[in-house]
Amino acid sequence: MRHVQAELSPSSEPEAGPSQPPVRQGTLQGGLLMGYSPAGGATSPGVYQVSIFSPSAGASEPPRALKRPAPPTEGPRELKRGPGLGAREGLPPEEPSTVGLLSPEGLGLGLGVASQHFSHHGLCVVEHGGNTTSPWTSGTQSTPWLSSNASFNTLHTRDWAFPDQGGQGCLGETPGPAPSGQLHTLDTDLHNLAQIGGKSPVARVGNGSNPWPRESHGTANGHSPEHTPPGPGPPGPCPTKRRLLPAGETLDVSSEDEGPAPRRRRGTLGCPLAANSSDAKATPFWSHLLPGPKEPVLDPTDCSPMGRRLKGARRLKLSSLRTLRKGPGLLSPPSASPFPTPAVSRTLLGNFEESLLRGRFAPSGHIEGFTAEIGASGSYCPQHVTLPVTVTFFDVSEQNAPAPFLGVVDLTPLGRKGYSVPKVGTIQVTLFNPNQTVVKMFLVTFDFSDMPAAHMTFLRHRLFLVPVGEEGNASPTHRLLCYLLHLRFRSSRSGRLSLHGDIRLLFSRRSLELDTGLPYELQAVTEAPHNPRYSPLP
């Protein structure tokens, strides 16, 4: 590395020629030490190192100006191209040379420390302000020392780019004669980095914004933030802060630290977009938050008395139709009772018997504990089974007249085929009360040998009390119904006969007491459908 050291001379006249500065003993005086290292050869970028020495703040020696003779007469100095720039444009690459030039303002400001080191790798510092005449180009005496608060605009550029000023192009073009203030490749206003007062390391350019965060000169490694060679971002640990340009202002292309700010969409809300969407397929979990259907517009005729009467009549008609279709028994939940309850409708059938069997009376209560034992005999004897019986009683009169009980035996626990019986034989059904006492034993004889496959039919077995001697001639008005057993039969596709569905029973809760002294006896009557006798399965 080659060094060029400049110190303040006690004489006010410039020296006759370039000479080595004397080495002073004792206190170090103010001066400037410049050096250049080719690093990797002529083709690799060099490193410029500038050391500014200044007396301490308490030094009593007044500041002195430095004068140097003008360099030999030469043409207008062109801006130095960076290594590799000429090769890209078809020009031969230039040899890097040791260039360390001072402006007269470089030594005019005292620093608060003994020395400051500035190392620039591929960095070009160009002066934008301060229209002063350089003593090296004009040969005149340098200007007096400026005050410490004097500010000069400096521009740091990377990749050897140069801003367009006064119609000049970039360094890639052939530059014309540059102003005297721009002939220096190193502006000595770099010492403004160490100034106290919160000034930016790079002077404000154009709009006066500060692209780098302010940082103290005492860093962790004891060097200035500018000691680190410039990289893709600004020097220092802080990331680059981009600014947003106001409307109507264009971006300053001369600043490398401020890139194009991202555009912010106006009118966007902080809430997510999906909150304003109505796509129920994409976001089904918030569909309940959507507004419900609009209320129907009221017809003006509904406010009139006639409209209200018509509306009420229509509601009553719809309610009655629903009641007839479903039945009152279906309106209650099925879990309200542990046993099945026949559907009840207010519409009665032709006689009292049919109305009870089909559940057209509303039940007054239920009795639990009844059981029924079912058996059959014939060509074979199936195993007897015992099933619970659901018993329901009714209140059908106001004179406390006896009303029969309705018992329902559900055959569903036996399976889909029901209880298998022979085609010709006898069925025995024994009813037990909660005390396991026999209430009634029913014996029914049947013959369904001519029943085709996949058909169904039923048998209704009744027990009447009739006067003795009138068994065959007893009128229906003289018969009293005591017990009833209703059985349903079905033949499978293979021809097997079985009981299916349920078994319904009617029985009295106490013995019938007759007022007359005529003797009565029980008469059994078994009936089956006649036309047709068998019906095909649905």
UniProtKB/Swiss-Prot annotation:
Keyword Transmembrane recorded: no
Modified residues (Phosphoserine): S254, S255
Pro residues composition-biased segments: 227-238
Signal peptide segment: none
Chain residue ranges for the region called Transactivation domain 1 (TAD1): 436-444
Region feature (Required for macropage invasion): 348-430
Disulfide-linked positions: none
Its biological purpose: Transcription regulator that syncronizes transcriptional and translational programs to promote macrophage invasion of tissues.
Entry's free-text remark on domains: The protein contains a transactivation domain (TAD) which may be required for transcriptional activation of a subset of target genes.
Family: Belongs to the ATOS family.
UniProt name for this protein: Atos homolog protein B
UniProt organism field: Mus musculus (Mouse)
